[in-house]
Amino acid sequence: MGSFKDDREEVLQAWYMDDSDEDQRLPHHRDPKEFVSLDQLAKLGVLSWRLDADNYETDEELKKIREARGYSYMDFCEVCPEKLPNYEEKIKNFFEEHLHTDEEIRYCVAGSGYFDVRDQNDSWIRVWLKKGGMIVLPAGIYHRFTLDSNNYIKAMRLFVGDPVWTPFNRPHDNLPARQEYLEAFGQKEAANHVVDAAA
């Protein structure tokens, strides 16, 4: 008997990033590679599911998640040079480290891309989201997004109520959403970075 494998890992993988300034669309693995489990992501408040991307219109699992979490709003966003107006500018904006005062929910129905999130020690974790993967980033987590080398993702965006996509670029540690995130997920270390820099 083989060991139990989480089927989410086929559409969601995560690892610690290196510090290289090379093309942001490359994997940026450390050497040796340091993978991060989906359970570790959950401890940062990052939730994930594997869903049937070919049948999202009739998927009962998606319907249950939306009802349970109150995701009343839905639309789609295609990110690629041909489909996104002001592509270069948008991609730069997506890759600026920022937070939101609400959850960011993305369900990849085609293509793939990277969501980078900060861990408790302010290190970057790269989350590779592929077709069928759905991810929820909690309000208040510092993160950023980029395409991978395939240069294409089509994602369903979900939201509770009317959508607000306002990014607050780092630093915005004074926002209640950030304070609540730190309290919920124990990121006390992040506050010490300011002290370290001044020492």
From Swiss-Prot:
The record's remark on the cofactor is: Binds either 1 Fe or Ni cation per monomer. Iron-binding promotes an acireductone dioxygenase reaction producing 2-keto-4-methylthiobutyrate, while nickel-binding promotes an acireductone dioxygenase reaction producing 3-(methylsulfanyl)propanoate.
In this chain, Ni(2+) is annotated as bound at: 98, 100, 104, 143
- Reaction equations catalysed: 1,2-dihydroxy-5-(methylsulfanyl)pent-1-en-3-one + O2 = 4-methylsulfanyl-2-oxobutanoate + formate + 2 H(+); 1,2-dihydroxy-5-(methylsulfanyl)pent-1-en-3-one + O2 = 3-(methylsulfanyl)propanoate + CO + formate + 2 H(+)
Give the main EC class: oxidoreductase
Which GO molecular function annotation, any one, does this entry have? iron ion binding
Superkingdom is Eukaryota
Its keywords, alphabetically, are: Amino-acid biosynthesis, Cytoplasm, Dioxygenase, Iron, Metal-binding, Methionine biosynthesis, Nickel, Nucleus, Oxidoreductase
EC number(s) from the headed UniProt entry: 1.13.11.54, 1.13.11.53
Annotated binding of Fe(2+), by residue: 98, 100, 104, 143
* Cofactor(s) listed in the protein's UniProt record: Fe(2+); Ni(2+)
Task: Sum up the protein's function in the record's words.
Answer: Catalyzes 2 different reactions between oxygen and the acireductone 1,2-dihydroxy-3-keto-5-methylthiopentene (DHK-MTPene) depending upon the metal bound in the active site. Fe-containing acireductone dioxygenase (Fe-ARD) produces formate and 2-keto-4-methylthiobutyrate (KMTB), the alpha-ketoacid precursor of methionine in the methionine recycle pathway. Ni-containing acireductone dioxygenase (Ni-ARD) produces methylthiopropionate, carbon monoxide and formate, and does not lie on the methionine recycle pathway.
Task: Write down what this protein is called.
Answer: Acireductone dioxygenase 2
